[in-house]
Amino acid sequence: MNLSPREKDKLLVSMAAMVARRRLERGVKLNHPEAVALITDFIVEGARDGRSVAELMHAGAQVITRDQCMDGIAEMIHDIQVEATFPDGTKLVTVHQPIR
């Protein structure tokens, strides 16, 4: 299987998001990479499903809460920017203050 660097990155984010979901199910608080991966995966999959950029910018800030993250993680993540593939092309989605 020959994957491009972009495809490898998407696969890595998806795998990290799966780990984050499992940890949340067990009640384990997320660290920085896990929180970013979970939100990023939500945006990428939402774009794939045909949701709009505006929808994803709003919904991306509701994926996880402060209580689901280790102390200080919400303050570390000011913005998350994801280049996602929509039905009409690739667009940049920015989520401001993604953990509230």
UniProtKB/Swiss-Prot annotation:
It is found in: Cytoplasm. GO terms for molecular function: nickel cation binding; urease activity. GO terms for biological process: urea catabolic process. Coiled coil: none annotated. Keywords: Cytoplasm, Hydrolase. It comes from the Bacteria. InterPro entries: Urease_gamma (IPR012010), Urease_gamma/gamma-beta_su (IPR002026), Urease_gamma_sf (IPR036463), Urease_subunit (IPR050069). Pathway: Nitrogen metabolism; urea degradation; CO(2) and NH(3) from urea (urease route): step 1/1. Signal peptide: none annotated. It catalyses: urea + 2 H2O + H(+) = hydrogencarbonate + 2 NH4(+). Belongs to the urease gamma subunit family. Heterotrimer of UreA (gamma), UreB (beta) and UreC (alpha) subunits. Three heterotrimers associate to form the active enzyme. This is Urease subunit gamma. It comes from Rhodopseudomonas palustris (strain TIE-1).
